[in-house]
Design a protein with these regions (language model features):
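Alpha-helical transmembrane segments of multi-pass small-molecule/ion transporters
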Residues: 1-175
Length: 175
């Protein structure tokens, strides 16, 4: 609604408003706040948001939905495999776990480098950027509180959801 009122390009500016940084920021904060209980819920929320990044986010950017994009996206397969491991309570091989951690650290560096390059090409207004950033971190929790009340959530699950909804826009939105 905010983007519509401001007459902004929904395909370019909706993903940063609806897809927060639940992975790199949200998971560690939830782990700190709620321990391993919060980590599980935060990871599940982050997985759903990542799926939205690589489906809804791509759909909005291209303005055309194609299942090819979904089937060509490695994170989608990684999440499916992770869900299968969790569902069947399988032990992750040590070499796979170690490799995943190493790739994670390398990926964070590459994503931040890509973000820096992408931001040099953006033309933006400081006023609009501040307004949209505040909209993201204010509207997310407001909507989350409505959801928490509607579904009668409580305890650490409600807290984790609230923390995750308050995260700023994710780097993936700008790449």
């Amino acid at each position: 609604i905010l983007l519509f009122i401001l007459k902004r390009d929904l395909s370019m500016e909706l993903p940063p408003m609806i897809l927060p940084n639940t992975g790199n920021m949200g998971i560690p904060i939830c782990l700190f706040a709620y321990g391993t209980q919060g980590l599980g819920v935060a990871s599940a929320i982050a997985s759903v948001i990542i799926l939205f990044h690589f489906t809804l986010g791509v759909f909005l950017a291209k303005k055309d939905f194609s299942f090819d994009v979904v089937f060509k996206s490695p994170p989608v397969y990684a999440i499916i495999i992770s869900v299968l491991f969790l569902y069947f309570n399988l032990e992750v091989p040590v070499f796979l776990e170690n490799t995943t951690f190493l790739l994670t650290y390398a990926t964070i560096f590459l994503v931040l480098m890509s973000l820096g390059i992408a931001l040099t090409r953006f033309k933006f207004s400081l006023k609009d950027s501040i307004l949209l950033a505040l909209g993201r971190v204010i509207l997310g929790p407001v909507i989350c509180i409505i959801i928490i009340n509607k579904f009668d959530l409580s305890g650490f699950a409600a807290g984790v959801l609230l923390i995750q909804s308050a995260m700023p826009s994710a780097v993936l939105n700008y790449l």
